[in-house]
């Protein structure tokens, strides 16, 4: 599992897809604070590309950019907050949230962690590497992920889901690598900053894995949760 946790079951994944636009709107709104021009705002460019791949309506996308950049005259106070702790069976995780009310969110996250353990800042982040994470699919069977990683400037790569490859980069290189991958025969599906576990937990029984999955799914259902990065092997 490792790195970014994703809903595995088809029904749950279908339900989760309904939340994608809401999460992307928050990301776009935050990114647009630094300017509405994707040519000069790398973070905004990455999120806009993700929104387009998710088939976000143009009107929704443009409104989020205008809202974040202040063009609509609205005051948007979204805050990005990160929580660290453990799922059941001492599985470390980092939870990234975007919220307009930090006090409400932290209270609700504490409740969501009742079957795990919410830790202080730094309690588990030392056991993760902060990296750029680019998910890309090969344009042809001949596409070589190792060669693509070298040529594009990625630090490493690993198999992703459904035939895709996860390219790992230095945080500062994320934008440059995702721009270079298409020239190496890969279509970028998503690109973001995230956390890669150094020592993922392994050897859990099926019953223990089910407990961890249920815990993570409960967290993922929270409206303010944007991403979860889990130190779990497999």
From Swiss-Prot:
Keywords in alphabetical order: Cytoplasm, DNA-binding, Transcription, Transcription regulation
Predominant cellular place of this UniProt entry's protein: cytoplasm
Keyword Cytoplasm: yes
BP terms from Gene Ontology: regulation of DNA-templated transcription
GO cellular component: a single term: cytoplasm
The UniProt record lists the keyword ATP-binding: no
Domain of life: Bacteria
InterPro entries per the UniProt record, alphabetical: Integrase-like_N, TACO1_YebC-like_2nd/3rd_dom, TACO1_YebC_N, Transcrip_reg_TACO1-like, Transcrip_reg_TACO1-like_dom3, YebC-like
Pfam families: TACO1_YebC_N, Transcrip_reg
An MF annotation (GO) of this entry: DNA binding
Subcellular location: Cytoplasm
Alphabetical list of NCBIfam families matching this protein: PRK12378.1
Similarity annotation: Belongs to the TACO1 family.
Protein name: Probable transcriptional regulatory protein PFL_3960
Originating organism: Pseudomonas fluorescens (strain ATCC BAA-477 / NRRL B-23932 / Pf-5)
Organism taxonomic ancestry: Bacteria, Pseudomonadati, Pseudomonadota, Gammaproteobacteria, Pseudomonadales
């Amino acid at each position: 599992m490792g790195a970014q946790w994703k809903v595995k079951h088809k029904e749950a994944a279908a339900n989760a897809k309904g939340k994608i636009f809401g999460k992307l709107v928050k990301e776009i709104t935050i990114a647009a604070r630094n300017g509405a021009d994707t040519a000069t705002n790398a973070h905004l460019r990455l999120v806009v590309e993700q929104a387009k791949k998710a088939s976000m309506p143009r009107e929704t996308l443009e409104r989020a950019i205008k809202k974040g950049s202040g063009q609509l005259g609205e005051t948007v106070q979204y805050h990005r907050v990160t929580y660290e702790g453990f799922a059941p069976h001492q599985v470390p995780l980092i939870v990234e949230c975007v919220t307009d009310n930090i006090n409400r969110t932290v209270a609700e996250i504490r409740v969501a962690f009742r079957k795990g353990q919410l830790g202080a800042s730094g309690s588990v982040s030392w056991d993760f590497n902060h990296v750029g994470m680019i998910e890309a699919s090969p344009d042809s069977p001949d596409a070589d992920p190792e060669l693509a990683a070298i040529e594009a400037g990625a630090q490493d790569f690993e198999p992703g889901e459904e035939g895709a490859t996860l390219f790992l980069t230095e945080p500062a290189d994320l934008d440059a690598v995702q721009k270079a991958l298409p020239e190496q025969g890969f279509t970028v599906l998503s690109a973001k900053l995230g956390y890669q576990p150094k020592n993922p937990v392994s050897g859990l029984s099926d019953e223990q894995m089910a407990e961890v999955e249920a815990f993570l799914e409960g967290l993922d259902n929270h409206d303010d949760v944007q991403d979860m990065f889990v130190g779990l092997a497999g």
